[in-house]
Amino acid sequence: GIGAVIGTGIFVLTAEAAQKAGPGMMASFVIAGVVCAVAALCYAEMAAMVPVSGSAYTYSYAVMGELIAWMVGWALILEYAVAAGAVSVGWSGYVVGLVENAFHVNIPDALVRGPYDGGMINLPAMGVAALVTWLLVIGTRESAAVNAVLVGVKVTALAVFIALAVPVIHMDHFTPFAPLGFGGISAAAASIFFAYVGFDAVSTAAEETENPQRNMPI
């Protein structure tokens, strides 16, 4: 869950949200966080009541029947497919930057952008997706170990960023607070919502959790 929430979204979408909301992006994070917290509480309650694998599919099946559960299941497949593509593209930017700065190799734009962005194919994104797929194939223990390491790296990076940024905060940088008004803040909140998504992955482990009625909500 932590690995999914503290992921590509918080690193990549922050710049996009800043363009929409400016300093008001702070309010966007709060709005998106409150909405996600409400959804997360629902997931926690359902996971405690129906402690089996399947997440939203199982909850829909138990409450509304097979047809709705079937629709939710396919919606989840679409969601995870789109999310995997978005995360792969986000990591692609980091891979390209690393290759260009560390090895001084310039990759043609046609090979790092999809057709929608004027390129042919995003090879780094495909490589990232293939690597993650390979980790999942070789075993849960190995992929969990890699995920734990990556979570540690991401949390450390955020902690270092906060420690370095707080001493140089100037209130002049927060004026104007919302250059595009509430419309910009709400648009940024919609983008930032993706950065919080991942709490639903926690509920999938309810069946393997000891005392899920107590531990899942926590």
Task: Name each model-derived stretch.
Residues 1-10:
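The first (N-terminal) embedded transmembrane alpha-helix
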Residues 40, 132-136, 158-165:
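Structural signal for membrane-spanning alpha-helices in multi-pass inner-membrane proteins
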Residues 2, 30-31, 74-82, 127-134, ...:
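Hydrophobic alpha-helical transmembrane segments of multi-pass membrane proteins
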Residues 4, 32-36, 76-77, 151, ...:
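Residue-level recognition of pore/gate-forming positions within transmembrane alpha-helices
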Residues 25-26, 103-127, 149-218:
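Helix-loop-helix junctions that connect adjacent transmembrane segments
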Residues 10-113:
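Extracellular loop-to-transmembrane helix junctions
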Residues 45-47, 71, 75, 114, ...:
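Membrane-water interface regions at transmembrane-helix termini and the short interhelical loops
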